[in-house]
């Protein structure tokens, strides 16, 4: 079942001179299995929105349901995995194992069941078992992000909610997170990610929700977003589209910009080589 928001409004410092309207009359429906990107500038209301999904924040008006239930219910909280923008802010246990096990133990699962979930989540997040005894805060930024992700996955969530999961990571860390999310999406998990920059996520998203000043100004597919918002294709995407129009399929894996350029240059070199061979063959035929 979906997440449904109806006429949601959220205020900070309500009924004071400092009152701020963070969300205004938001209506949104997220279906099971979707990969949704929530896009907007800093302060637009993105992070406020996702805090509603598992009851971290209550709306001042309107109604939200997750699988038909109130998001503050224990059943919903156990099915919604959250990963925050700064992984260090949610990593507080002494070891990676304890960190990943925290959620299942907190929701009453046995130690045996919890151990199974820890190893399952570890693999899903592409982490090595040798890391289980390490201090989470001693890890690299990308590794900490994946530990936080594993902690969310240990709940076997129906919904995975991510707040700027690749912000601040180096290219290798970003690639690891994106490839992990692609794998998780293939298992049928609903993924909702907040971002101020679609770079990296764009090939994975099935729907984009654009928030401006607390209101949803657009929601639709990637194609609709680019047409409606007049988004120019970056050079790499333009080149890939040109190759596809010629019937040339480029490896659809999640690329870094450098990898995409290498792939495109490889294919273009192949085209030029075939063209040269064809011209030589035609010249020999004429002789």
From Swiss-Prot:
- Keywords, sorted A to Z: ATP-binding, Cell membrane, Membrane, Nucleotide-binding, Translocase, Transport
Principal localization reads: membrane
- Documented EC number(s): 7.-.-.-
One GO location term (cellular component): ATP-binding cassette (ABC) transporter complex
SUPFAM superfamilies listed in its UniProt record: P-loop containing nucleoside triphosphate hydrolases (SSF52540)
Enumerate the spans annotated as ABC transporter domain: 5-238
What InterPro entries is this protein classified in?
AAA+_ATPase (IPR003593), ABC_transporter-like_ATP-bd (IPR003439), ABC_transporter-like_CS (IPR017871), ABC_transpr_CbiO/EcfA_su (IPR015856), ECF_ABC_transporter_ATP-bd (IPR050095), P-loop_NTPase (IPR027417)
Q: Which CDD domains match?
A: ABC_cobalt_CbiO_domain1 (cd03225)
Q: Pfam families recorded for this chain?
A: ABC_tran
Q: Cross-referenced SMART domains, in alphabetical order? A: AAA (SM00382)
What GO molecular function terms would the record report? ATP binding; ATP hydrolysis activity; ATPase-coupled transmembrane transporter activity
The residues that the entry says bind ATP are 40-47
Query: Which membrane topology term applies here?
Result: Peripheral membrane protein
Q: Where in the cell is it found?
A: Cell membrane
Q: What does this protein do?
A: Probably part of an ABC transporter complex. Responsible for energy coupling to the transport system.
Give the record's family classification. Answer: Belongs to the ABC transporter superfamily.
What is the name of this protein? Putative ABC transporter ATP-binding protein MM_1038
User: What organism is recorded for this protein?
Assistant: Methanosarcina mazei (strain ATCC BAA-159 / DSM 3647 / Goe1 / Go1 / JCM 11833 / OCM 88)
